[in-house]
């Protein structure tokens, strides 16, 4: 295992409980493109339950400021020790904790649930709650494979419930600024190429807890390693920016750079998507030197680099040179996944086609991830239409 100084380890885990799934910390750089202090809510709260605590993005909702838009009425987690630990950290009553979805439903009937369990278990959550008319949001990606995704989508459609998928990058001001630049032909215009660099030094290296590592590094429970964990971000945003277009071909090379740490799964994946007029490159890794989720957008002549949630570099032309930009703030109520879910369920917000959280987008994401996995196994490019006619 790599040796890190205590200073380096501290830097790696600062915040990134939200960003990379381990400790809940404060961000080293305040993201002013996402200011929750402006958010005010009026009306009855959305009564929600949390399904699972083993995905540590759960700290996002447990540590969220109470603004009256959601009310946590129950938590499903069979691991009482973990539930007790988080109870002491966040101050919720253990009376809210139930050992199963059945036990929760006997006493409480939530309007919506947020799934922070294993990706493999997303299907079971939808199978249980969709027939009861309960709306659902899961953590990215939607499902471990295309078979699970199809079953989930069918249930959501049959029972007319929302099935949304949450990504950290959906709440980056820079993500939306990039789309506005693409839509403006005077700024970037039609996309010729997208490049995504996503990941971190590794879940073990950044200090993820055992309950998270147990399934995150399992090929069945997570659907793979770095490929689904960080390949999904680029697949999600590119499907949105390219308005749901399906790639023509998908190529992927996976590696095990640290088999002593991650013997069951790939810790790096390089995905290449070919489209009619553009291409997408996704570099997903648990072996970066640092935490990163950045995006490069190439137009015919202009270039935009989204360095993080708020900082961007814009190159309109070689002659004009680079300009440093800050992303615009997200609108209150559309600044985090929980407020957004309330907007959809309580305030009548209609998602645009292939919206980042939408089911249609995330079905495409699962298709891309599955095609990438097959490409890596075959060691050749795969035709998308042959896999998904």
Question: Which sequence ranges carry the predicted segments?
Answer:
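Beta-loop-alpha module in the N-terminal Rossmann-like domain of NAD(P)-dependent dehydrogenases
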Residues: 92-155
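N-terminal Rossmann-like dinucleotide-binding module
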Residues: 23-91
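Predominantly a Rossmann-like dinucleotide-binding segment in NAD(P)-dependent oxidoreductases
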Residues: 172-253, 257-261, 379
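Rossmann-fold dehydrogenase core element
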Residues: 36, 151-169, 192-194
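Contiguous beta-strand/loop segments that form the cofactor/metal-binding neighborhood of enzyme cores
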Residues: 30-31, 35-42, 234-311, 339-349, ...
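Bacterial N-terminal signal peptides that target proteins for export
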Residues: 1-10
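C-terminal motif of bacterial Sec signal peptides marking the signal peptidase cleavage site
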Residues: 19-21
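C-terminal helix-rich "cap/oligomerization" subdomain common to oxidoreductases
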Residues: 23-41, 112-114, 344-389
